[in-house]
Regions:
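Short beta-alpha connecting loops at secondary-structure transitions
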Residues: 66, 123-124, 214
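Hydrophobic alpha-helical transmembrane segments of multi-pass inner membrane proteins, especially
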Residues: 1-99, 137, 141-199, 226-230, ...
Length: 245
């Protein structure tokens, strides 16, 4: 179909198991972002290991179908979808939709060049904040507000460069384990950026995933530094093996 060969049904067993785990995460943790990161990283590893795009196509279809089913049958998932669709609706913008609405207002206020570094209005004179969670969930909105479209694109370019180098390290690795390790770590990193930036810009529903190396949070920063260290380890080992006689 469209140049994609569908493998035998029995080979989809691992995909079904991980899909079930991702859907369980969606039910128990109630976090679409974490579920998407988990399943997306698995699809990336599956593609690298098998070189079959059919697994990715079927996997994306399964995840979309599962997300649609649970959004139609679980109230809290449906509420999250409704807020994402129209955060400016009457009765929503002052409650559940306040966070994403203020995020969009802040980004629009930033314009092309931004209002200036450290010049965003985060706190109201009488107390409270205009942008909720400005150092964690919505820190990308603060970046767009202060540095504008140019600064926001520069931040995304840095992330894109890290992801490109990570996947290149995966292609240069000398053994299958190192290849899968580098590809999996890079996929997790890229998906983490996509989930938080996509949520802040209203591409996907907003979740509580942190922006790598920028959002406040000790464990998140340590985890991402460990991720980069492992990528550097794989890269160094591949370089040494390539230059050794």
């Amino acid at each position: 179909i469209l140049g994609i060969t569908i493998p035998p049904l029995k080979q989809f067993g691992p995909l079904l198991v991980v899909w079930g785990m991702a859907m369980l995460m969606l039910i128990v943790i109630r976090d679409l972002g974490s579920s998407l990161m988990f399943f997306g990283a698995f699809l990336a590893l599956l593609y690298v290991a098998t070189n079959r795009a059919s697994f990715v196509v079927v996997g994306l279809g399964m995840f979309s179908l599962g997300a649609w089913f649970f959004s139609s049958n679980l109230a809290y998932v449906q509420d999250r979808i409704d807020i994402w669709r129209d955060p400016f609706a009457r009765g929503v913008i002052d409650n559940e939709g306040y966070q994403i609405a203020q995020s969009l207002f802040a980004q629009a206020d930033g314009g092309v060049l931004g209002v200036g570094f450290g010049q965003s209005l985060l706190a109201l004179p009488g107390g409270g904040t205009i942008i909720p969670a400005p150092d964690t969930d919505l820190i990308y909105a603060v970046i767009v507000n202060e540095l504008g479209l140019v600064g926001a694109c520069a931040v995304l370019f840095v992330y894109l460069l890290i992801a490109e180098r990570g996947f290149r390290i995966a292609t240069l690795a000398r053994d299958s384990f190192s290849t899968l390790l580098a590809a999996g770590l890079t996929a997790v990193f890229a998906l983490q950026v996509f989930v938080i930036v996509g949520g802040v810009t209203k591409v996907i529903p907003l979740t509580g995933v942190t922006l790598p190396f920028i959002s406040y949070g000790g464990s998140s920063i340590v985890a991402n530094f460990v991720l980069l260290a492992l990528l550097l380890l794989v890269s160094d080992r591949a370089r040494r093996e390539a230059t050794s006689p």
